[in-house]
Amino acid sequence: MSVDKQLRVMIMAGGTGGHVFPALAVADQLSSDNAEISWLGTRAGIEADLIPKQNIALNFIDIEGVRGRGLLALLKAPLLLWRSITQALAILSDFRPQVVLGMGGFASGPGAVAAWLKQIPVVIHEQNSVAGTTNKLTAIVAKRVMQGFPNTLPKGEWCGNPVRTEISDLAPPDLRFAGRSGKLRLLIVGGSRGALAINTLLPKALAEIDPALRPEILHQTGRAHWQQTIDLYDNETLGLADSELSVVPFIDAMEKAYEWADFVVCRAGALTVAELTSAGLGALLIPFPFAIDDHQTANGQMLVDHGAAEMIQQSALTAANLAAIIVSIMADPDRRLTMAMSARALAKNQAAQDVAKVCKEVACGQ
């Protein structure tokens, strides 16, 4: 690619926020360098709603996962895969990118195969500490392999997980926490789709805490569980003022939520872990028990090992022990700050720039 020719990048990412938001962080970086971006995803993923709002061209292919879906799905898989590759070939022929970037999700596999067939170089980024099936396969044809955690893929380069600059630009926790007083500010996040188990237990746990000590709550429930969670809070009659309890289906401005919070109760998805380090916040991690290859436990272990988080498996979680953990965190502001500073020390805030740089290098034949 000549230096005066505009870079065109096809980004392939979808399904959940854990794939889409890191990819958007890279897209922002590439766009700031005047690259033209097009997106490959599916109609069923979160990208179908989010990407058009970013003024990025969005293309769909028809593909879904088959793992755990039974024999019939496996038998249909080759035909469906070939159809999705054919669709991706047509989209690539129309856009003519110099490089494609796979950030995970069902669209990445067919898109990477189509790019390889058209001799368009492929870059992939694996967010989790345990690689997904798609990235294990696409790594074979990729020119460069980037990864959010060390030692995930054989030829992977550890750059961290891309995080939006609005989060990485937050003041460090020692400055944010300075002068704070009053109740603990507790942020509850179960991922972009919410977490039913956390939604169900939190109101019950709060009911076991002395009413005078109950923390202020900002709780992202996921759109499907919003009303149900509100009803659970109402049933517990917690006595929290409207200003002390906010239950929302989705938080668009996560940077504001992180800036407000003293501590987080959350899953251990790769994006959540990266954002905790970037913002600098201690957390109680509750890994999703049905994550493929239990990758959320592996993701969260890095924070635990560095004193930035506690972790408890969902199978061991009760309202009583969740309440006890919250009370212990409330009682020890020095510990909260130490955990937050330990998280911040793990941040790799140049990840988006690093992935964008690799895309440009690969497009130029380096």
Q: What role is predicted for each listed range?
A:
Residues 6-14, 33-80, 223-225, 315:
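Conserved nucleotide-sugar phosphate-binding/catalytic loop shared by glycosyltransferases and other
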Residues 19-30:
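Short amphipathic alpha-helix
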Residues 36, 46, 57, 116-174:
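Active-site-proximal region of nucleotide-activated glycan assembly enzymes
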Residues 45, 50, 54, 172-264, ...:
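Donor-nucleotide binding loops and adjacent catalytic segments primarily
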Residues 70-99:
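An amphipathic, basic-hydrophobic alpha-helix
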Residues 97-99, 251, 255-274, 281-282:
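Acidic donor-binding loop of glycosyltransferase active sites
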Residues 335-349:
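A short, well-ordered alpha-helix in the C-terminal region of glycosyltransferases
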Residues 348-366:
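C-terminal alpha-helical cap of glycosyltransferases
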